[in-house]
């Protein structure tokens, strides 16, 4: 189990919830360990996890067409309700292996008409027909929400996506292990991309090499911003046929997904000498991130972390440096809490995993960015990174 269930239960008690329902792709996967594929590839498909209070078993609600995913994923929740029609036949002349036996068992279970019918059935069996239920509002369609409220009129449904965010903010040891591996694979992809750096190589060719390394190491590409020269100042630069020239800066703002968990990091390199201004400005944004390591610890106000990082970059060489945020949490979603901004009311807690970043974009010049994945430890910070933060000269 990856989910921080003790934290979930504590927050449910605090918020007065008799049950909570996960509905969006990230929360369904996080809470159950089940990856409902259709949720991740298009909008609209419904999958839920019902998590009742003490004394009741949780339930996964999923479309019949996804039942074949259950044996390989082995979710920790054993009660799986299916809805919708899907035809699959069984060769009764052979002995089914364990995976096929489980599929046969699941396909032999009751098929509810739709996702809401399955959810309502599970709730009624557990006696959840009144009280207060938190529902993650980000994945359920308005039509399904209307049906759910009509079927259970005595329940007060309260939006609780923010509760799931608060739960996910504190990582379990297994989550931290996966995030560390995701970081290592992504760093390897940056190295792989830079291994082909020479005059004439295009941004697009570098991205292909980056993505290939991710895939070769069982990770999936998610973000691949790689820009050369003045194109590096494009905030969300998408690789083009721009060819690398001597003196060009190369900016990476990249990430992947490994076992459903995200990586997100930034590094800079240059083919030959990029010039004094780039060296000076890059050193400033690097020192901003390094200053974060000096002060990160449980209890630190996130707003204070923001202010100190910005002030460091300003002091170290970019006096006009300004940002809306200098990082964010990361986990099964690329932007878990906290958002490292001046307006944040959060404080750092042990076993948060955050991305600390100091991007600087100047059109006509360059984009400079350092971003590290960092775990908040009992008394400080632990980098999940192995690549040096300094500007790499090729």
Please place each PLM-identified region on the residue numbering:
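Active-site neighborhoods and metal-handling regions in enzymes and metal-associated proteins
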Residues: 1-394
């Amino acid at each position: 189990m990856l989910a921080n269930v003790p934290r979930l239960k504590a927050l449910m008690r605090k918020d007065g919830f008799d049950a909570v329902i996960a509905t969006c792709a990230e929360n369904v996967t996080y809470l159950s360990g089940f990856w409902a594929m259709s949720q991740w590839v298009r909008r609209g498909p419904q999958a839920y996890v019902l998590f009742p209070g003490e004394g009741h078993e949780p339930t996964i609600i999923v479309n019949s067409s996804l039942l074949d995913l259950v044996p390989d994923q082995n979710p920790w929740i054993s009660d799986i309700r299916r809805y919708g029609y899907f035809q699959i036949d069984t060769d009764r002349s052979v002995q089914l292996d364990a995976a096929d036996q489980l599929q046969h068992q699941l396909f032999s279970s009751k098929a509810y008409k739709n996702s809401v019918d399955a959810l309502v059935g599970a709730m009624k069996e557990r006696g959840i027909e009144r009280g207060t239920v938190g529902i993650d509002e980000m994945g359920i369609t308005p039509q399904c929400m209307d049906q759910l409220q009509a079927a259970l009129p005595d329940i007060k449904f309260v939006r609780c996506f923010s509760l799931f965010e608060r739960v996910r903010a504190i990582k379990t040891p297994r989550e931290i292990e996966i995030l560390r591996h995701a970081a290592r694979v992504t760093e390897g992809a940056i190295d792989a991309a830079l291994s082909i750096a020479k005059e004439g190589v295009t941004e697009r060719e570098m991205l292909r090499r980056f993505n290939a390394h991710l895939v070769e190491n069982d990770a999936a590409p998610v973000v691949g911003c790689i820009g050369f020269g003045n194109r590096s100042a494009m905030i969300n630069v998408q690789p083009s046929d721009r060819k690398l020239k001597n003196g060009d800066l190369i900016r990476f703002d990249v990430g992947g997904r490994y076992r459903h968990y995200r990586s997100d990091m930034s590094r800079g390199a240059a083919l030959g000498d990029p010039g004094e201004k780039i060296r000076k400005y890059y050193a400033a944004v690097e020192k901003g991130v390094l200053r974060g390591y000096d002060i990160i610890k449980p209890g630190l106000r996130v707003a204070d972390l923001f202010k100190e990082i910005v002030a460091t970059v300003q002091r170290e060489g970019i006096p006009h440096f300004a940002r809306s945020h200098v990082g964010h949490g990361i986990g099964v979603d690329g932007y878990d809490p906290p958002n490292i901004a001046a307006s944040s009311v959060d404080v750092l807690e042990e076993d948060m995993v955050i991305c600390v970043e100091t991007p600087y974009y100047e059109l006509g010049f360059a984009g400079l960015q350092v971003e590290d994945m960092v775990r908040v430890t009992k008394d400080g910070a632990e980098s999940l990174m192995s690549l040096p933060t300094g500007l790499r000269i090729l």
